[in-house]
């Protein structure tokens, strides 16, 4: 219900533009992030459902990039020490049983929404809605074990069913 590192509400879809922001979302000097405990719990639940190892230590990294969709100039993400790693998901596609290895399940914060405006003349410009910035984003990273579109569909269908069952999605 809240963003990844602050208490702003995460229901940005129907909210007025830039109404779900705070100094933490904007990365203003002197602000400190506080982790969303529920997002961590959901990620660990997902990892366990995928047979992942849950390490005792994890960390978040600061991924720097200068794009306009992230006001602070960096994204808080995980890479080398995720919340869950080394899992698998067994699927059936085209009558064949397959195992898709899951490299990791990690958390990061989503970026802002860009809206490109082009009225047909030379005043084309982009608008930034920061409401989505900081919303928890869980990523499931699989190994390249899927060989056909049918296997990819079976993988995503089963993963979606698991996330729905857990109440994570």
What positions do the PLM features span?
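Basic, nucleic-acid-interacting segments
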Residues: 1-169
């Amino acid at each position: 219900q809240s963003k990844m590192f602050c208490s702003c509400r995460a229901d940005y879809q129907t909210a007025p533009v830039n109404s779900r922001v705070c100094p933490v979302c904007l990365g203003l000097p002197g602000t400190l992030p506080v982790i969303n405990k529920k997002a961590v719990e959901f990620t660990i639940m997902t990892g366990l459902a995928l047979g992942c190892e849950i390490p005792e230590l994890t960390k978040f990294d600061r991924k720097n990039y200068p794009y306009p969709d992230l006001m602070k100039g960096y994204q808080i993400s995980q890479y080398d020490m995720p919340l869950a790693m080394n899992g698998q998901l067994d699927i059936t596609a085209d009558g064949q049983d397959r195992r898709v290895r899951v490299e990791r399940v990690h958390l990061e914060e989503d970026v802002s929404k860009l809206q490109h405006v082009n009225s047909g003349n030379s005043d084309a410009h982009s608008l930034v809605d920061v409401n989505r910035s900081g919303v928890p984003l869980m990523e499931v990273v699989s190994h390249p074990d899927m060989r056909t579109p049918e296997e990819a569909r079976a993988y995503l269908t089963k993963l979606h069913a698991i996330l729905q069952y857990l109440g994570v999605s």
